[in-house]
Amino acid sequence: MRTLLLSACAAAFVNLAHGQAVVQPPKTWTTCAACHAAQGAASIGPPLASVVGRKAGSSPGFGYSRAMKNAQITWDDKSLAAFLSDPQQAVPGNRMPFAGVTDPGEVAELVKYLKTLR
C-alpha cells in the first residue's frame, strides 16, 4: 500500500506527455505572468520559454529596446538573478517597467523556475 501511495504521488508530478517533472511556479511568478507567457507567443513582454541560454533581446517576434538588443548577455543563473533584482541596473535603458524583486530567495526561486521552461 505504501509503495502504491508513493507511486501515485510521484505520478502526480510527472508530465506524461513530455516525461518531465511538473514544477509549480513560485508566488512571485504571478507578477511576471502579468506581462510574460511561460510558453507561446509574445505578449506585453517576450515569452520566457527557453530563456536560459538565450542571448538577451533575441526572442523572435518581440520588439525589444535598443538597450536589450545591444546587451551582451546570454541568460544564465547569474545574469537572470541580476536582471530580476534590478532590471535597470542590469540593462540600463531596457523597457521593462518593473523595479525588481528585492528578496534574494524569491529571485532564486524565479531563476529555478525559468530554467524549467522549455
Name the predicted role of every residue range.
Residues 1-4:
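Positively charged n-region of N-terminal signal peptides that target proteins for export
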Residues 8, 61-63, 91:
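Short, basic/glycine-rich phosphate-binding loops at helix/coil junctions
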Residues 10, 14-21:
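Boundary at the C-terminal end of the N-terminal hydrophobic targeting segment
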Residues 11, 32, 55, 87, ...:
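Alpha-helix boundary/capping residues
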Residues 20-43, 48:
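Sequence/structural segment immediately N-terminal to covalent heme-attachment motifs in c-type
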Residues 24, 69, 96-99:
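Generic anion/oxyanion-binding catalytic loop in active/binding sites
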Residues 37-76:
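Gly/Gly-Pro-rich "capping" loops immediately C-terminal to redox-active cysteine motifs
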Residues 76-118:
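C-terminal capping alpha-helices of c-type cytochrome domains
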